[in-house]
Amino acid sequence: MATPANQTGRITQVIGAVVDVQFEGHLPAILNAIETKNGDNRLVLEVAQHLGESTVRTIAMDTTEGLVRGQEVTDTGSPIMVPVGIGTLGRIMNVIGEPVDEQGPVANEGLRPIHAEAPLYTDQSTEAEILVTGIKVVDLLAPYAKGGKIGLFGGAGVGKTVLIQELINNVAKAHGGYSVFAGVGERTREGNDLYHEFIESGVNKKGGGEGSKCALVYGQMNEPPGARARVALSGLTVAEHFRDQGQDVLFFVDNIFRFTQAGSEVSALLGRIPSAVGYQPTLATDMGALQERITTTHKGSITSVQAIYVPADDLTDPAPATSFAHLDATTVLNRAISEKGIYPAVDPLDSTSRMLSPLIVGEEHYQTARMVQQVLQKYKSLQDIIAILGMDELSEEDKLAVARARKIERFLSQPFFVAEIFTGSPGKFVDLADTIKGFRAICEGKYDHLPEAAFYMVGAIEEAVEKGKKLAAEAA
């Protein structure tokens, strides 16, 4: 709600990231941005509570060192506003929409408030539709819903970032869509690396503008909790603008746990009584307010991929448990698979999707996915026997299942466009129909005669056949 702008108040108390401000006249509304100067910097405070006696309690979006009591503060009359539009692509902004990449001001198509209502149910599209990513393992076994939310689980160094880059690249190519990356409370070094990797891999152009596909909004680990608790909303606001223009947008959040963690810090500073495991009492409300805005409308869609850190690997911890309630699919990256050199290292048995139903994806896709999982599961259950007794002790039927499973494992790998500079092999975008056809044929034994090496790092099944012929010719 807008209130009269330019009302001035004075700081009465500063405790860490929490600043109390007293206003003589009209009090600024809850969630309004109020501004002051801290040295040469513009400091934005967001109103969180009305305390009485004309005083509001605010959360600072930057460090509060240097603020003094009695300092003048001005009400902007609206929530935090961030630039939106094509000009944000290829740029890095902070939580309040200021550029932090030293490439000049952000060209924008206007400003939007970071706090907004979720779209009305009547505006939402209720059709279940798949977002084809061109990545075989994802499209076949854990397909993404257009306008859905996907949890990305994985430890350090198993390929989360490369998978994210490939998704951004493929969505831009296949759907002409843009992406927004919100870096929430992660390492500054990783944020810097990602920015440069995006430029190197062709996802973005230096300085942004034409040819860039992804906007970056960062609030990293060293920022105060106010910035980390709001930066996901700033990124989402940029994505919502693209959606309202009729785009299919990909919205990445790395890491959704840090959003909850920052909310917990802010909550404690505001003096709220903590709830389970010390989290904020408003945990489900905060998460819902963010997640419900990520949806498909009749204009366009926002599909969200959220990296989820699981504290102490405890899936019952309130933070990840609250995230799970909103997810449509999970993509689990497994170190054991990456150690075999199979990339993307997506676990085909652990990754799940609500979309994998015959009513949504069709009977053929569903049956093929289940056949693939059955073969892989059988191989997994035989691995102990193979390790102790060797392959020779297996029955003929089991030997065949193992051979097919090893081919499937290798066929689940594929060369990425964004990794061409490392691998030297050109990236492949595989259509869904080709993916289904290829895996079905392997399960039915049509390619039992080909060596398993033929299936490694190829796109469609035809390439595996060609590679098989080449390998045979070289061996002859």
Swiss-Prot record:
Q: List, alphabetically, the Pfam families matched.
A: ATP-synt_ab (PF00006), ATP-synt_ab_N (PF02874), ATP-synt_VA_C (PF22919)
Q: What is its EC number?
A: 7.1.2.2
Annotated catalysed reactions:
ATP + H2O + 4 H(+)(in) = ADP + phosphate + 5 H(+)(out)
A GO MF annotation of the entry reads:
ATP binding
Query: Where does this one sit in the cell?
Result: Cell inner membrane
The membrane-topology field of this record reads: Peripheral membrane protein
A GO-annotated cellular component: plasma membrane
Coiled-coil region list: none
Which HAMAP family is this protein grouped with?
Answer: ATP_synth_beta_bact
Q: How does it assemble?
A: F-type ATPases have 2 components, CF(1) - the catalytic core - and CF(0) - the membrane proton channel. CF(1) has five subunits: alpha(3), beta(3), gamma(1), delta(1), epsilon(1). CF(0) has four main subunits: a(1), b(1), b'(1) and c(9-12).
Instruction: Spell out the protein name for this chain.
Output: ATP synthase subunit beta
Q: Which organism is it from?
A: Rhodopseudomonas palustris (strain BisB5)
